[in-house]
């Protein structure tokens, strides 16, 4: 999530619209209406002219009322935290979302403003938890409810059977990104991870169903 020029929470990964749309410039330099008029599928085969514009968070929450969502905040900014929570409340979606970010400040703002919404560990919190797992020093009552993490960070292994056990002992679920290979999916599931974040949901659904049989 990012904020448009007029302070609306919009669903967009990059800081600029250049890579994915037919527009140019920073997301923060355009209003929500201007972002909505762009072609969000412009640079993707088969989606040019068909994907619509950059959506607002409240539109997505209302369109997919039966879907549980992870909302990632791309700015370490308290205003983004508050406006995101406001959108979640307005859509009556508090019970079906979790919020993640690399930034500690924005996650602390979410937790203070709406304690009912589960949040992921920030990069700093994840790093500390990983170190503690290496020395078998348990986390006591963490502020976060999820790890939303890659299996590897550079040359450092984040997710391992030990890390998953450590997280579960602390009451924290482990969601791993970005897992597109089926053999990786099966291995991670065998370690007990709670969710796979993937660019290939078609593969992931089949692997998860097979593992549950």
Model-found features: residue ranges?
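Short gly/pro/ser/thr-enriched loop/turn and capping motifs at secondary-structure boundaries
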Residues: 18-19, 107, 126-129, 203-205
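Metal-dependent phosphodiesterase/phospholipase catalytic core, i.e.
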Residues: 13-113, 142-170
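Short alpha-helical
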Residues: 4, 78-79, 105, 182-183, ...
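Short acidic, Gly/Ser-rich segments with clustered Asp/Glu that frequently serve as metal-coordination loops
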Residues: 1-10
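Alpha-helical scaffolding within the catalytic cores
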Residues: 53-59, 125-136
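Structural detector of well-ordered beta-strand residues that form the stable sheet scaffold
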Residues: 10, 70, 98-100, 118-120, ...
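A cross-domain feature marking catalytic cores of carbohydrate-active enzymes
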Residues: 1, 73-75, 101, 121-123, ...
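C-terminal active-site rim and adjoining tail of enzyme catalytic domains
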Residues: 47, 122, 130-213
